[in-house]
Curated annotation (Swiss-Prot):
It comes from Eastern equine encephalitis virus (strain Florida 91-469). The modification Phosphoserine is found at S110. Residues 98-112 are annotated as: Ribosome-binding. GO terms for biological process: fusion of virus membrane with host endosome membrane; proteolysis; symbiont entry into host cell; symbiont-mediated suppression of host gene expression; symbiont-mediated suppression of host toll-like receptor signaling pathway; virion attachment to host cell. It is an enzyme of class 3 (hydrolase). Disulfide bonds join C850-C915, C863-C895, C864-C897, C869-C879, C1061-C1073, C1103-C1178, C1108-C1182, C1130-C1172. A motif (Supraphysiological nuclear export signal) lies at residues 44-51. Glycans are attached at N272, N935. Residues 83-113 are annotated as: Binding to the viral RNA. It catalyses: Autocatalytic release of the core protein from the N-terminus of the togavirus structural polyprotein by hydrolysis of a -Trp-|-Ser- bond. The modification Phosphothreonine is found at T113. Structural polyprotein: Specific enzymatic cleavages in vivo yield mature proteins. Capsid protein is auto-cleaved during polyprotein translation, unmasking a signal peptide at the N-terminus of the precursor of E3/E2. The remaining polyprotein is then targeted to the host endoplasmic reticulum, where host signal peptidase cleaves it into pE2, 6K and E1 proteins. pE2 is further processed to mature E3 and E2 by host furin in trans-Golgi vesicle. This is Structural polyprotein.
Amino acid sequence: MFPYPTLNYPPMAPINPMAYRDPNPPRRRWRPFRPPLAAQIEDLRRSIANLTLKQRAPNPPAGPPAKRKKPAPKPKPAQAKKKRPPPPAKKQKRKPKPGKRQRMCMKLESDKTFPIMLNGQVNGYACVVGGRVFKPLHVEGRIDNEQLAAIKLKKASIYDLEYGDVPQCMKSDTLQYTSDKPPGFYNWHHGAVQYENNRFTVPRGVGGKGDSGRPILDNKGRVVAIVLGGVNEGSRTALSVVTWNQKGVTVKDTPEGSEPWSLATVMCVLANITFPCDQPPCMPCCYEKNPHETLTMLEQNYDSRAYDQLLDAAVKCNARRTRRDLDTHFTQYKLARPYIADCPNCGHSRCDSPIAIEEVRGDAHAGVIRIQTSAMFGLKTDGVDLAYMSFMNGKTQKSIKIDNLHVRTSAPCSLVSHHGYYILAQCPPGDTVTVGFHDGPNRHTCTVAHKVEFRPVGREKYRHPPEHGVELPCNRYTHKRADQGHYVEMHQPGLVADHSLLSIHSAKVKITVPSGAQVKYYCKCPDVREGITSSDHTTTCTDVKQCRAYLIDNKKWVYNSGRLPRGEGDTFKGKLHVPFVPVKAKCIATLAPEPLVEHKHRTLILHLHPDHPTLLTTRSLGSDANPTRQWIERPTTVNFTVTGEGLEYTWGNHPPKRVWAQESGEGNPHGWPHEVVVYYYNRYPLTTIIGLCTCVAIIMVSCVTSVWLLCRTRNLCITPYKLAPNAQVPILLALLCCIKPTRADDTLQVLNYLWNNNQNFFWMQTLIPLAALIVCMRMLRCLFCCGPAFLLVCGALGAAAYEHTAVMPNKVGIPYKALVERPGYAPVHLQIQLVNTRIIPSTNLEYITCKYKTKVPSPVVKCCGATQCTSKPHPDYQCQVFTGVYPFMWGGAYCFCDTENTQMSEAYVERSEECSIDHAKAYKVHTGTVQAMVNITYGSVSWRSADVYVNGETPAKIGDAKLIIGPLSSAWSPFDNKVVVYGHEVYNYDFPEYGTGKAGSFGDLQSRTSTSNDLYANTNLKLQRPQAGIVHTPFTQAPSGFERWKRDKGAPLNDVAPFGCSIALEPLRAENCAVGSIPISIDIPDAAFTRISETPTVSDLECKITECTYASDFGGIATVAYKSSKAGNCPIHSPSGVAVIKENDVTLAESGSFTFHFSTANIHPAFKLQVCTSAVTCKGDCKPPKDHIVDYPAQHTESFTSAISATAWSWLKVLVGGTSAFIVLGLIATAVVALVLFFHRH
């Protein structure tokens, strides 16, 4: 257990101490004299033995030497070969000592693993991992530790574990777990465990009962799994284990057919005698020796949890070894026999058929159905033979080749497998199922109504299994044994009258009993006599019609069918394993051709060419999901509008894709007017049209007003000449329209007059036009370009505190950057980026619901009497007694009465076999927690994938820093108060409460778990009167509400959730919802700051934007020239929100330049760049991006995309200034003329 010391010197042979010599030695015992030749041979033998490397053999017992007839000559080397020494004794093979790594793991396991004691023996183990003690739930007993035994353990039945927190004194001395499990070998108590293909396996025979709870360790002594059980798979044993995934969530991996490795022995009962279930007593011993007693033993232990062990022991007969484990499963059905039952359609009419169809199940994918019949397959009358089938030929059992069997729907089916009462076939779609066989010239068939459909997997409706594609979860029927949870109910057959046992002998009715059988008879001549006989018996009746004889068959079971009469008295039940059970598997589904994608400005065009109907779903990643869902059946083209918030589309079985729009354009915001108009029209068509219409209206109004004013001025000028007859208007006056021959005061005189008489009016007259012009121009300038100037104040400024607080958007992948400033220290760069966010609500499982199965036991037929119903604890149990259903001496019951015969029909509901893999869980959702995984960098410290709670209270240690995040600005969740989880999808659905389900709707079958006994059902089950003369139990029932809900459930939450939420399970959560913002507060330690004297001082900064593409992911490149006091590193940051800098810091020389990348949404970015303690402003022009649609979100805000370029503003000023000139000139001319006329009149 402990490491051995290492020798640092050559090993030496041990030195023997000097032997002790007695001063008075005893006298030697007398020994017989050996001849000299014998002494020489003995010396030679000893010499050869000493030369060998093997251990010396013990000396033979002393005795007289062997007598020889002739003295042997002197030994020679050749003779030495003939006289070989006796073979040396073999060394006892010692186990190799474990290596250092193994010894370390063994010591860790022994110190942290505690036995669980039950009745004085070890029943399993409990281990202490990560501050908790884990105990297998199936292991009964008490932990052999006083402190751990006093802990109150919590049960986690889904993981088959019990767990509890260890005392504080033991928390520092516990094992640690890990989720890293690379393929290879790991350490276990019994040796190496191989991990490959996500499975832990050991050689067969290693480990077994009593090893449940032992941990599996890696080379560092960390726990990678806890063993719960195992199952033999050929030469290796697959282990059932509990592991942890990358997120620290417990995961249970249980191979099919695994058995818990608890050492406790379960006891069974037979005639008030208890015995181990795997060792039945010698009286029944096994089925071959005592069939009836064995069946009785199984029936009495029907509800035992070790029924499988008892059944396995009864079939194997203990001492008898089977060839393979699979044979045990096949030989189980030797306990049963075929039977004849009612068939609704035998090809011509209703009949009692030897291959009646009991049930058809089509819950698997790819058109595979499972058919249960009254015939048996894979068995002959004398044993197991997969090439044969057996059926009841009248009263006897007959076997024929399986090649005579056929199954068809709308076309012949392909036989996949068969065993027992079951057939597994892959059939084409159809409305009926027919099973039949040929027995020489006889042809037997049975047809029932059942709709068979090809159920595709995924989001594509293909009709045939593809050769290649993508693997998706699906349902299949297994071809091998499943030992738990799926049984077919059996019972000993009822009595059926047999006319062949009755005959007339000496005018009396004689009952002939077959050898080794028993016959029950019932005679009425005229007194009623009945009894059981095992030998021939002669009655007093004279007519065969007066007697009935029943052959008692208590050596075989038959299926508990509603088409067979039930046996008399208390009929016990047995059960056998269903050979083909539904399981979760992986199926290959088709993959539709990739769509041809075409990008335009804010438009995504998909050219789709499906081979079969394919589902296309889309949703917006903003606050309004606006989901769409359509099946595409033929080649088509669809268009979708894409915004900066993003769009997600899913085509068929392809994974979802997300795209985002970029602010691209066709024109040039820095070009000629028509290019500017084209650019803005492509981006903002409505705004551009309104702006152009406004400009045109201004121009038209300006021109009309100017012309009107000029015409008005001209009229004022020429009016005096119009009043004078034959007046000649001078040509110059006609042209200028304002010159008159009379003299008047000019403008200077008028201004002089106003200055001398009314100075206030002088200043008003002079300044009002100028003020109006300035006000108009300023209003226009503020309207078009002052918006960005206002928004420039938004952004994260450097924090001048040791504790930095800020608010960052709740968007995964968008980093928050800032410079944390502290007096006397150089600024420290801070970056926080969300890697993952999770909204985890608290849930309460109300119930699970699934498809139900109607169980119809064999009816009770009472001849010449009445029976009554008794209540039974079955869900939706129905019982009813019908009278007068069998005619006189009818073949099924052979009653002597007519109207007095009665039948008691029963029916109830239970879970279908598919419930274990196909069920929905109804949860109530309450307020939960928000968690985030962040990457944080401050200074030279970088911390990856730190998990924090977004609640504003719980601090997280990030190195030496303390971080507090939250709470979210919006208390929002995509989950309603009630959700339904089905498979890997989640649905918001208002389900009924437990115990209030309605027939035909969701929740018509409810239970707390998939195996609990608290089953509630409401299926509107009604029993109907059976048809006279036919043993059957007709009933009506509402269709399954679970199946109806599956058809009408709509789109899952993953396709309709807003804000781009991704819904996941285990636990139920919403990931990466881009909603609201997150406050952050971080305390940065002093060690992250550097004295300002130790950092470079930067001066003479000059920034030039060399290349810039706005609205693109870091599409801007700028170069900064500088001079530095010394070489070193400086953080760079832009405190404004105009640009986001990609680099966090730069390396500076004493002089030179450096280049950085930035991302911006402004076409004229002007942002402040801070380098160490200095700052510089970077300005430039940006061109639009070429890509309209990209597959990554923007790394900047979109607050500045509406800004007008400087070039566009210049053209606008020219346009507005040109049109205003006409108005100004007209106003000036009008004003001058008005003044002239005013002064002329006065």
